[in-house]
Amino acid sequence: MHALMILCLAFDLAAIKLEPNLERRSERALDNAAGAMDTARDASSAGESEKVKAAVEELRDSVDLAYQSLVDSGKSARRSPKFFKRAELKTRELMRRLEGLAQAVDAEDRVFVVSVRDRVSQVHDNLIQDIMQKK
């Protein structure tokens, strides 16, 4: 069951990577991250530690893909902020939800969830810096 869930999540991320439009790829990756967050929350409620970890890893990979897609687009966040701002808002929401998840999981899983929250926070800070920088 656990392997099947990982395979399904990886398939979704692989399909997202095939999206040729980098901005749309970023949005789809962040939507996938939100879905992974829902999966992690449900698994946490059910007490399934391995599923929580797999879903949080998927969330981290999705956020990284979203940010890298925006960077690879070559567009300036200052001149074309639409997708950068959307990503910033979604990562802020994910950080808030990860904080709640970190408080809900066991102590052994908390370290991993907090490390992913810190990574999402770093991406969020990078997005804000990209939007706010002058040249």
Describe each region flagged by the PLM.
Residues 1-7:
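Sec-dependent signal peptide recognition
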Residues 8-135:
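Long, charged/polar, soluble alpha-helical segments
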